[in-house]
Regions:
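Predominantly soluble domains enriched in secretory-pathway, periplasmic, or organellar proteins
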Residues: 1-179
Length: 179
């Protein structure tokens, strides 16, 4: 049995895989084929799922509760990406996953247990400094708020941080913060 409290996710970049390493014995206990050049691995709030996203914008969802952890869902959310995150707020644990892409300039809100897309939000807009239109702002870091059902989305070239409140997804409230 895998000790999930002492498990590490390591990107095997050139192989296009993620290895799961037991922290006690330092051995690979499972590995999964993933997208190209995995950029980040994120654990779900429950600890059941590990989400990885490659620079090719492919997300793989690995179920760690299986006897041998394996990819149970995957989706390609764009052409280039860097970040994925899952909801952490009490009552919303594992409900949503959010991925941001460099191209097209957007973030995608998905079901956290299946990666089914629910909403796509474009990030094109004006820069905070010169108020010029930027057609290709890249979404960089995405972080889940532990105190509200929202995600903090960093939109690079615009100089904005977006606070996407997922309380009512059909009426998504996005607050812009100039940085």
């Amino acid at each position: 049995k895998i000790n999930l409290e002492n498990l590490f996710s390591v990107t095997l970049r050139d192989a296009g895989e993620v290895a799961l390493i037991d922290g006690a014995c330092k051995k690979i206990v499972a590995s999964s084929k993933t997208g190209h050049a995995v950029h980040i691995s994120r654990m779900s709030a429950s600890g059941r799922y590990l989400f990885v996203i490659g620079r090719d914008a492919k997300i793989d969802m690995i179920d760690l509760w299986m006897e041998k952890p394996a990819v149970v869902a995957e989706i390609k959310v764009g052409l280039e990406a860097r970040s994925v995150e899952t909801s952490k707020y009490k009552g919303f644990e594992d409900k949503y996953a959010v991925a941001g892409t460099y191209w097209p300039p957007q973030f995608v809100i998905m079901k956290g247990d299946s990666l089914e897309p629910l909403k796509i939000v474009a990030t094109r807009g004006m820069t905070v400094d010169t108020q010029e239109y930027h057609p290709e702002p890249r979404v960089a870091a995405i972080v889940a708020n532990h105190h509200k059902p929202e995600f903090v989305v960093n939109v690079k070239e615009t100089g904005k941080v977006l606070m996407a409140n997922c309380s009512f997804l059909n009426n998504l409230k996005v607050t812009e913060i100039a940085t």
